[in-house]
Amino acid sequence: MSVCSSDLSYGSRVCLPGSCDSCSDSWQVDDCPESCCEPPCCAPAPCLSLVCTPVSRVSSPCCRVTCEPSPCQSGCTSSCTPSCCQQSSCQPACCTSSPCQQACCVPVCCKTVCCKPVCCMPVCCGPSSSCCQQSSCQPACCISSPCQQSCCVPVCCKPICCVPVCSGASSLCCQQSSCQPACCTTSCCRPSSSVSLLCRPVCRPARRVPVPSCCVPTSSCQPSCGRLASCGSLLCRPTCSRLAC
């Protein structure tokens, strides 16, 4: 049996590929190039790339039929019940368990930012950080991190590891973060510059210099036994000599 052509824009109706034998006369569209029928769960609607708008939000069979083949279309995300996301093939764990759907995130029903290959990343659109903190994507990263509001951008659920991105002079955020303790814990010197966006120890003691005697945690990163440290690069290294220490 013939099917509709790919050009589906015919007034206010949608022509979908299908056999006329399976549809009633009321769903036939006369102005199509060939005879075709609309699915029984869809009402006449503008063409949405082979996606017809469900009749009602409570019509779960309609959502399953129209949304599952292409769950990322705008027709599904705007008209379907939450079952559209829950039944999605992108990442069910992201669409089903994430508490960010209504609270502070944009609809992430199978958008490209939602269905990451490794882990799901909710898209936050408000100042509140409760979305990422309560997310089930990576609890260790999103729940325990104190950086959401204070000095870091939301970094919930990065594919490999959560790296806080700090802005400002305070390093307390990353020091207490559970994302990367080895990277963000303090060294023997405090950061002398906030040029680097990555919170990492920017001070290292000079070679063959005892740490207790030559690297004192002062705000200026000045060793107790020598001159001011050279802070031209991202790593602030004490410049005291071996004899001075």
Swiss-Prot record:
- Which GO cellular component term is one of those annotated? keratin filament
Q: Extract the Pfam families matched here.
A: Keratin_B2_2
Tissue expression notes: Restricted to a narrow region of the hair fiber cuticle, lying approximately 20 cell layers above the apex of the dermal papilla of the hair root; not detected in any other tissues.
Q: Where is this region: 19 X 5 AA repeats of C-C-X(3)?
A: 36-218
Keywords from the UniProt entry: Keratin, Repeat
Q: Is DNA-binding a UniProt keyword of this protein?
A: no
TM region(s), chain numbering = none
Which positions does the entry assign to sequence repeats? 36-40, 41-45, 62-66, 84-88, 94-98, 104-108, 109-113, 114-118, 119-123, 124-128, 131-135, 141-145, 151-155, 156-160, 161-165, 173-177, 183-187, 188-192, 214-218
SUBUNIT field: Interacts with hair keratins.
User: What does the UniProt record say this protein does?
Assistant: In the hair cortex, hair keratin intermediate filaments are embedded in an interfilamentous matrix, consisting of hair keratin-associated proteins (KRTAP), which are essential for the formation of a rigid and resistant hair shaft through their extensive disulfide bond cross-linking with abundant cysteine residues of hair keratins. The matrix proteins include the high-sulfur and high-glycine-tyrosine keratins.
Q: Which family does it belong to?
A: Belongs to the KRTAP type 10 family.
Q: Tell me what this protein is called.
A: Keratin-associated protein 10-12
Q: Which organism is it from?
A: Homo sapiens (Human)
Gene name of the encoded protein: KRTAP10-12
